[in-house]
Amino acid sequence: MRLDTIINHDALCALRELPAESVHCCVTSPPYYALRDYGMDAQIGREDTPEQYIARLVEVFRELKRVLRPDGTFWLNIADTYCGTGSKGAYTDPKNPKGRNGQSLSLARRAAGCKQKDLIGIPWLLAFALRSDGWYLRSAIIWQKDNPMPESVRDRPSRCYENVFLLTKSKSYYYDAAAIAEPIAPTTAARYRGGRSAGHKYDGEVPGQGKVQGINRARTGGYYDEALMPTTRNKRDVWHINTVPYKGGHFAAFPPKLAETCILAGCPKGGVVLDPFFGSGTTGLAAKSLDRHYIGIELNYDYCTLARARIGGETN
């Protein structure tokens, strides 16, 4: 199997050519439903109904499950959309309101049981469909964007997040919590240093770590202080990651930090990271920077060319 390479092909067909249980991790963001037009035959995202869209993705990710190692992880970034007429000015791609190629989109968005202006619920419909297809649904992460795309709506809150689901092939899998651990809050550190009085909520223990001898005594420094006081905590499921402008021709690239976080947690060094919707190659760029191998699959030849130039050093 070739590594550090980009395959210009349909995702499903390309996945069928990969060996079983050959990749450690998948990080991907498939085309969102009815929000943009690649201008390509066989593209995903232009189906007549959400049900058809989800069925196609389930089929692709079923083949991904075959390719993924038993201890592998699958990180899926997906956003929602609204039911509407598809007229100009309706809900558009949160990453690029004018479409991938600068065109204004006018796509009908219809869903069974949904009224015009209803939020369809695409992320959770897909997550539940994947769970029914045998995936373990392990975490629903909120990618919180503190610099979101402005919206002109006045009858609902503006959107500022997308979903990232962690799915796995098995109930036991590779996950490096320490690699993405967060520093504890300054107030928490101060509380540890100062000790606690008897009867405190966490009397004699560090939250999440159980009883620790001497936790109620004030500590003034030295090796005792360092050994006793934790400096990090398990990463929470709300990730504050800003979008990053990209000057290339692919306007829907997610930020490298998002891909890096998933890869650090879900793929060992030297492992193989797969992205079946490679786009401009953010996943490959992140994998390479973290000493992991990558395999990218992308339907659009122009994006393959863009990704190769962006990543550099492709071996195949």
State each model region's role:
Residues 1-316:
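Core catalytic lobe of class I
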